[in-house]
Amino acid sequence: MGTVQLPATPLCIDDVNTYAKDLKIPNFVGCHMIDLLPSKSRKKECGIVNLESSSEKGSHWVCWYKNGKERIYFDSYGEPPPPELEVYLKTKKELEKSKLCIKQSSVTVQKDDSSECGSLCLYVIYYLSKGYPFEAILNVLLNRYRKPHPLTIHNV
């Protein structure tokens, strides 16, 4: 078992997919642009998505984690999930009733001048896949936001 220090620099799709593979994140369905999400959601999965379409160069990485009925969305700026991801994660009935069923953060854990959103997403889905509570992961990231230090994953 070792540690992996995630970069504070921008990551491309290939970088994210390589880190996810190296970290052995279970049920990872890949890194996608918002218009190229998988065709169907699985019962247990996680992934990372860029908020721009495939015709654009990319702007910001966000992620989701799904384990049965539990669905979690993470944006390092605390923004709500984009409509495309809500459609992907919710059932037809939940969409029709505008049901709030995706747990999400509303806190900012990334500085405006930072490009580490991809690394933050990898950190979140890695620890969610290990069974850590979302709130505990957010607390670690909030403390790091207040006192910046390298983003390190332990016990890989």
Residue spans of the language-model regions?
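Generic secondary-structure transition motif, activating predominantly at the C-termini of alpha-helices
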Residues: 20, 24, 93-96, 145-146
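Cysteine protease-like catalytic core of ubiquitin/ubiquitin-like
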Residues: 46-129
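General structural signal for secondary-structure boundaries
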Residues: 2, 8-15, 83, 132-134, ...
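Cysteine protease catalytic domains with a Cys-His-Asp triad
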Residues: 1-62, 66-71
